């Protein structure tokens, strides 16, 4: 969190994002060529890309070069992007959706956007900020809020993913709230590609 604003300011963050995308595409291509299961992977894109006219075209050209179907990439944007030019953002999200790339809004509820933004955003997945779960452990009203927030988002047509799941109690809360997906240390910590391959094999047994 401390170095990202610096890279956004000097413009280096866009190079980092595309380097990560290239590594993801290389992994997917290798997995497909070796007959391994290929799963969709989320790639975070900084709000700085909103000012780049050919942002979507750069993504698609990389997919075409590696011959990766768009369905294997999820473009992940943080909710802070809604502070920028919504016209350009809406245009880019629409082009991504048209191409077959899914879109997720990361860290939702971290303090930038409001719920009414969701009514006009083309996204597939809303990722609830980990703060919601930390509040749920401290405040008796928080689980009720989380439950109805998830229910509202699902009724709007979004899939909901909860970030920062670390305990069985948190998982049970989300299961009872009918949350679609979870991520967090309860299942796994960040890992290198070889370890991820083994994890995927074991997880699918």
Kindly give the residue locations of the regions a language model identified.
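Conserved, function-defining core regions and hallmark residues within catalytic/recognition domains
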Residues: 3
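Residue-level signal for well-ordered alpha-helical positions
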Residues: 9-10, 139
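Catalytic core of bacterial c-di-GMP phosphodiesterases, primarily the EAL and HD-GYP domains
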Residues: 10-88, 164
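EAL-family c-di-GMP phosphodiesterase catalytic domain
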Residues: 44-53, 72-87, 99-205
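Catalytic-core regions built around general acid/base machinery
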Residues: 59-62, 91-99, 148
């Amino acid at each position: 969190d401390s170095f990202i604003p610096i890279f956004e300011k000097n413009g280096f963050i866009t190079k980092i994002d595309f380097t990560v995308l290239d590594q993801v595409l290389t992994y997917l291509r290798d997995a497909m060529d070796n007959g391994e299961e290929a799963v969709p992977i989320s790639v975070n894109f900084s709000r700085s890309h909103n000012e780049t006219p050919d942002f979507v075209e750069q993504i698609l050209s990389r997919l075409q070069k590696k011959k990766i179907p768009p369905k294997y990439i999820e473009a992940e944007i943080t909710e802070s992007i809604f502070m920028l030019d919504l016209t350009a953002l809406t245009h880019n999200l629409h082009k991504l959706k048209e191409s077959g790339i899914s879109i997720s809004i990361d860290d939702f509820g971290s303090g930038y956007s409001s719920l009414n933004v969701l009514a006009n955003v083309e996204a597939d997945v809303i990722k609830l900020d980990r703060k919601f779960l930390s509040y749920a452990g401290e405040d008796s009203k928080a689980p009720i809020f989380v439950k109805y927030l998830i229910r509202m988002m699902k009724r709007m047509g979004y899939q909901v993913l909860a970030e920062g799941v670390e305990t069985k109690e948190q998982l049970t809360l989300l299961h009872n709230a009918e949350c679609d997906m979870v991520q967090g240390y309860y299942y796994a910590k960040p890992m290198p590609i070889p370890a991820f391959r083994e994890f995927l094999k074991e997880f699918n047994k």
